[in-house]
Swiss-Prot record, chain A:
It comes from Pediococcus pentosaceus (strain ATCC 25745 / CCUG 21536 / LMG 10740 / 183-1w). Residues 80-176 form the Toprim domain. One of its GO terms (biological process) is DNA recombination. This is Recombination protein RecR. Keywords: DNA damage, DNA recombination, DNA repair, Metal-binding, Zinc, Zinc-finger. Belongs to the RecR family. Gene3D superfamilies: 3.30.60.80, 3.40.1360.10, 6.10.250.240, RecR Domain 1. NCBIfam families: recR. One of its GO terms (molecular function) is zinc ion binding. May play a role in DNA repair. It seems to be involved in an RecBC-independent recombinational process of DNA repair. It may act with RecF and RecO. Pfam families: RecR_C, RecR_HhH, RecR_ZnF, Toprim_4.
Length: 199, 374
């Protein structure tokens, strides 16, 4: 026996989401049948609106409703520093910290030829034009992940930016705050010892 | 350390086995297909929770039974540690001192073993890739930094090769990114080469001693790290890094032509030399065997140096491959030092005379009998 077409289609749609297989998708689909009518309408609207109403900021590349985005438009932010991150989720993490008040630049990925991402495929060219145009920027903070690809991307950006005389910095590596040395893996410890600072 | 007792239940062709071993040389004597190697395998399994012969644990459980158990007690300097592994179709659990270990990685290391099987000859005879794999395995066990750098190196290498291929189709592509990848590769590569040379020196020192003894001082074994980087450039990581960078620059055009990275530790090799001649090309079968054996036996001393305890040595069908004098010297080299398990189909005259108080076990269809020698 087959499922009726509407639910089969719904299962199929859920399966397009990452991390959801056939069984989870079926469970979700049947759950949707029992949901309040209003909730379902809200859900459907939210799905459509997320794609329709969001675009990428023409300055920093972050997702936004208005172009340029709130952060780029905010004059109270420190115009001297730009923090470069891999994707928009990283901007949110940094913002939740509430201690960084500068600008952002979102790369939408890292350099990885294996995944078909070369220098032209991520948002680097826009960063360079931005630095050329905007003379207020004095520091580029590179906050790509501590993976080989993240490191390569950081090195690549620093090579392109440094000749212009703008300061390029990289986030620190090492122990995570509040963790026990006992539970840290050996490479993290090694990096932490290597990157120790004078007191 | 040595393995004092071993108990098998439904393991391979052993239905139930309880046996006590001697701390010296234990000879497992039997005809073909009686279960000699199965017994060695069970000891290897007790040490490392996996088999050297198969990746499927199901193969280890006797036919028509559902679960197997391997247990034993390990005598260390002052303590006796009981070990136990239970194996069923659902998986396995390991116990140290009757306490279940939540992770197998916590269990491994209680009993250290070194296995020498006829296949190990390929360290000498085989392709450079076999030797690289061997040194990566050995040195990775001793240094987590080495393990980290080789993992990073592999991943950067893949990216770099892919990018070079892309540049072939698009010659005007970004060269700065290639520079970045080259520098990254050189940085990890330099750490790897530096550590390889350091570890090889240690291994060479111990191998030479063993080799000298087996060959009665007639032959001298030495190692040579084969790399486009000359040895006078290799005394610090900074120098190796600079040398690798220069090589990448020099090879760039050729690399773009061939579409891959042409220098680096992933292409280096180790040459085993006996009396300054390359054993893998000019050595006799016996010399090759002796070299492989010396390298393996050197691991015993290296492990003692690193962990403070001698491991247990498992020799699978090695005696039959060596001539009488090499047998004699092998046995003297290990006598009174490490607990050794030797499988063989017959105990030749020389070996029998030489081994002091050997424990000889006759194996017949999965049943063990300790034979009382006069």
């Amino acid at each position: 026996m087959q499922y009726p077409e509407p639910i089969a289609k719904l299962i199929d749609s859920f399966m397009k989401l990452p991390g959801i297989g056939y069984k989870t998708a079926t469970r979700l689909a049947f759950f949707t049948l029992d949901m309040e009518k209003d909730d379902v309408t809200e859900f459907a609207k939210a799905l459509i609106s997320a794609q329709r109403d969001l675009s990428f900021c023409s300055i920093c590349g972050n997702i936004t409703e208005d172009d340029p985005c709130d952060i780029c438009q905010d004059p109270s932010r420190d115009q001297k520093a730009v923090l470069v991150v891999e994707d928009s989720k990283d901007v949110m993490s940094m913002e939740q910290m509430k201690e960084y008040h500068g600008l952002y630049h979102v790369l939408h990925g890292v350099l990885s030829p294996m995944d078909g991402k070369g220098p032209e495929d991520i948002n680097i060219a826009a960063l360079l034009t931005r630095l050329q145009k905007n003379e207020a920027i004095k520091e580029v903070i590179i906050a790509t992940n501590a993976t080989p690809e993240g490191e390569a991307t950081a090195m690549y950006i620093s090579r392109l930016v440094k000749p212009s005389g703008i300061k390029v910095t990289r986030l620190a590596h090492g122990l995570s705050v509040g963790s026990d040395i006992e539970y840290a893996d050996q490479m993290t410890l090694y990096k932490a010892v290597e990157g120790r600072t004078e007191m | 350390m040595y393995l004092k007792t071993l108990e098998l239940h439904n393991f391979r062709n052993y239905a139930d086995l309880v046996v006590e071993f001697g701390s010296g040389i234990n000879v497992l004597l039997g005809e073909n297909a009686q279960g000699k190697t199965n017994l060695l395998e069970s000891i290897y399994f007790l040490a490392l929770t996996r088999s050297h012969r198969t990746n499927s644990d199901r193969d280890l459980i006797s036919w028509k039974t559902k679960a197997a158990r391997v247990s034993g007690s390990v005598q260390k300097e002052h303590t006796v540690t009981p070990l136990e592994i239970n194996l069923s179709s659902k998986g396995k659990n390991a116990k140290v001192n009757h306490l279940e270990q939540s992770r197998l990685s916590q269990y491994v290391g209680q009993l250290n073993v070194i296995l020498f099987a006829p296949e190990d000859l390929s360290i000498v005879k085989g392709s450079p890739a076999v030797r690289r794999k061997f040194i990566d395995m050995e040195f990775g066990q001793m240094s987590s930094k080495y393990l980290y750098n080789s993992a990073q190196y592999r991943s950067v290498l893949k990216q770099r090769n892919q990018y070079i291929k892309q540049l072939q189709f698009n010659p005007k592509g970004d060269q700065v990114y290639l520079d970045v990848l080259s520098d990254q590769l050189a940085a990890h590569g330099a750490e790897i080469i530096f550590q390889r040379i350091q570890f090889l020196k240690k291994l060479e020192k111990w191998s030479q001693e063993v080799h000298k003894e087996i060959s009665q001082g007639k032959e001298k074994l030495s190692f040579q790290y084969v790399s486009p980087i000359s040895s006078n450039q290799a005394d610090t990581t900074e120098k190796i890094y600079a040398a690798l960078q220069a090589l990448f620059q020099k090879q760039r055009e050729k690399e773009l032509q061939q579409g891959k990275t042409l220098v680096g530790p992933h292409l280096d090799d180790v040459r085993f030399m006996v009396n300054d001649k390359n054993v893998s090309t000019f050595g006799s079968q016996g010399q090759q065997r002796t070299t492989a054996l010396s390298v393996k036996l050197a691991e015993i001393d290296l492990m003692k140096e690193e962990t403070g305890e001698y491991p247990v040595l498992l020799l699978d069908d090695v005696l039959s491959e060596l001539d009488d004098s090499r047998q004699t010297h092998l046995l003297t080299a290990i006598q009174n030092k490490v607990q050794t398990f030797i499988t063989t189909t017959s105990l030749s005259g020389v070996a029998q005379q030489l081994i002091n108080e050997p424990h000889v076990f006759n194996i017949d269809h999965g049943v063990l009998m300790q034979s009382k020698e006069e």
